[in-house]
Amino acid sequence: MTKKLHIKTWGCQMNEYDSSKMADLLDATHSYQLTDVAEEADVLLLNTCSIREKAQEKVFHQLGRWKLLKEKNPDLIIGVGGCVASQEGEHIRQRAHYVDIIFGPQTLHRLPEMINSVRGDRSPVVDISFPEIEKFDRLPEPRAEGPTAFVSIMEGCNKYCTYCVVPYTRGEEVSRPSDDILFEIAQLAAQGVREVNLLGQNVNAWRGENYDGSTGSFADLLRLVAAIDGIDRIRFTTSHPIEFTDDIIEVYRDTPELVSFLHLPVQSGSDRILNLMGRTHTALEYKAIIRKLRAARPDIQISSDFIVGFPGETTEDFEKTMKLIADVNFDMSYSFIFSARPGTPAADMVDDVPEEEKKQRLYILQERINQQAMAWSRRMLGTTQRILVEGTSRKSIMELSGRTENNRVVNFEGTPDMIGKFVDVEITDVYPNSLRGKVVRTEDEMGLRVAETPESVIARTRKENDLGVGYYQP
């Protein structure tokens, strides 16, 4: 009988990536097949996020639902992973004794052994250690699930912003070797992936070992990824302004595979608040980065993160944030009301901004960002945009859907053979959360780089010398 696995994932793209790796790993080692129905599963895994308010209570609420399933099926294995697991550890079992496995983001590769241990003597397993790069060495080969894919290139963060739990839950920065990253992306490209999104809590801080033992920069890595045949788009998430160096900006100038869209969190437009947050940059320094980026890539669009109502934030501080939003003309944002994360320095600060004031500031900020986003969308009306077709539209199974370089969803009429390929679409309608268009050019008409194999290169360039010995000229 087929054994089934159910994974519930909360949080960032890194968590989504981790969950996909858990599924691949347990399929390879235990032949577990994913199911969307928790009641069908032999193993339930909750991959948690500690960023949002009341994250811990949300976890225990979900576990309470799963407890009922365990009462019906005592052999059911329940595991809790992710950042809340890393933060709470054994405390989770003190409140939910029926949980069998607690694992951190850096120990998910040990899940097969943990499951075997629980199956063997029914004793619970807690492993929230930080074994650095070992996680990536133990994961199975990647499996593409469409034309886009996430690839983790580093873990952790050394910045220790005063509001953030990431350094405590995912550890300090650890970069994967460049060869490992490039090999994973090449494997994905061979499976039809056209766009990769490089992931890291502080992705542009990547410093990886090259094949010759030297240390490569993030800019070096971007150029190497762009050289992989079949990869036509590169995104990366999430960046820190302090690591956004001029050599990265130069990649935007000369590497068309790098999309004209960047998510670069700033959090506040007030230098005083940025200092309290431990951000180590000013609003002016942030704007200088954007100015240089737009000089290198004039059509680039910028999104950001914002926290409103940080302890000590005055009306003047908030107005400086609003001015920064107008000056940069952000295209979109992820914006939140400050809520203290246990164990962070900000949790010890006096939370002196009234809740209603926080809500009002968030509303004002989001309305302004939405207005700017709609203005950006309207500028696209009548233009031709290159779309990577991801599949059928959520709005209608009779239409296809894909994304522009600047991350806009576009719905249009097309044929199934377009899925996984690029099409050029003329934008005909603009809506708050999507665009609509009509196909004006297919990939066959674009002259994009065709996939090459070593064998095809040799066959095409093979020559013979005077002795009849074959050789090829790269």
From Swiss-Prot:
Class in the EC hierarchy, top level: transferase
Binding positions for [4Fe-4S] cluster 1 per the UniProt entry: 12, 49, 83
GO cellular component: cytosol
InterPro entries found in the cross-reference section: Elp3/MiaA/NifB-like_rSAM, Methylthiotransferase, Methylthiotransferase_CS, Methylthiotransferase_N, Methylthiotransferase_N_sf, MiaB_methiolase, rSAM, rSAM_horseshoe
Catalytic activity as recorded in UniProt: N(6)-dimethylallyladenosine(37) in tRNA + (sulfur carrier)-SH + AH2 + 2 S-adenosyl-L-methionine = 2-methylsulfanyl-N(6)-dimethylallyladenosine(37) in tRNA + (sulfur carrier)-H + 5'-deoxyadenosine + L-methionine + A + S-adenosyl-L-homocysteine + 2 H(+)
Residues of the MTTase N-terminal domain: 3-120
Domain Radical SAM core: 143-375
EC number(s) stated in the UniProt entry for this protein: 2.8.4.3
Sequence positions that bind [4Fe-4S] cluster 2: 157, 161, 164
Cofactor note: Binds 2 [4Fe-4S] clusters. One cluster is coordinated with 3 cysteines and an exchangeable S-adenosyl-L-methionine.
Keywords in alphabetical order: 4Fe-4S, Cytoplasm, Iron, Iron-sulfur, Metal-binding, S-adenosyl-L-methionine, Transferase, tRNA processing
Pfam families, A to Z: Radical_SAM (PF04055), TRAM (PF01938), UPF0004 (PF00919)
Keyword Cell membrane: no
Assembly and oligomerization: Monomer.
Family in the record: Belongs to the methylthiotransferase family. MiaB subfamily.
PANTHER family per the UniProt record, alphabetical: CDK5 REGULATORY SUBUNIT-ASSOCIATED PROTEIN 1, MITOCHONDRIAL TRNA METHYLTHIOTRANSFERASE CDK5RAP1
Official protein name in the record: tRNA-2-methylthio-N(6)-dimethylallyladenosine synthase
Lineage: Bacteria, Pseudomonadati, Pseudomonadota, Gammaproteobacteria, Enterobacterales
Gene transcribed to yield this protein: miaB
